[in-house]
Amino acid sequence: MTHIIIDGDACPVVDSIIDLTTETGIFVTIIRSFSHFSNQLYPPHVSTLYVDDGPDAVDYKIVQLSTKDDIVVTQDYGLASLLVDKVLIVMHHNGKIYNSKNIQQLLDKRYINAQIRKQGGRHKGPPPFTKQDQKVFEQSLLKVIHRIKELD
């Protein structure tokens, strides 16, 4: 059974994922560190798992829990690289799907930017997340959900 796991510490599309999976039979798990604790109540198909605040603790838990039938939503290229061959789909919150063809280029870009920062340089960060970005993500996730439902 398909399950969506969200790297929930900084994910701007949590509510969209919850709304789009309601009554689909797809369960959602939001994994967050305790520093992002929330009392927010979610529908029955959604669970929240909290982990320690250590570096990459959320990532390690996602790798541990994910299976071949899962969809993982993360903006972390390093985590995505560990999962592209392990899970069904790895998505960015911009709607793009990570795969073995594009992940190396993304990791290389991350490395180059880290080297620039290490030398005191700066590089342009990502633009602010917009309503249009959210709409693009929702359309991408809906396509994924429909594809999965066709396979079931």
UniProtKB/Swiss-Prot annotation:
Ranges annotated as spanning the membrane? none
Q: Which domain of life is it from?
A: Bacteria
Q: Matching NCBIfam families, A to Z?
A: PRK00124.1
Family per record: Belongs to the UPF0178 family.
Name of the protein this chain belongs to? UPF0178 protein SaurJH9_0705
Source species: Staphylococcus aureus (strain JH9)
Q: What is the lineage of its organism?
A: Bacteria, Bacillati, Bacillota, Bacilli, Bacillales
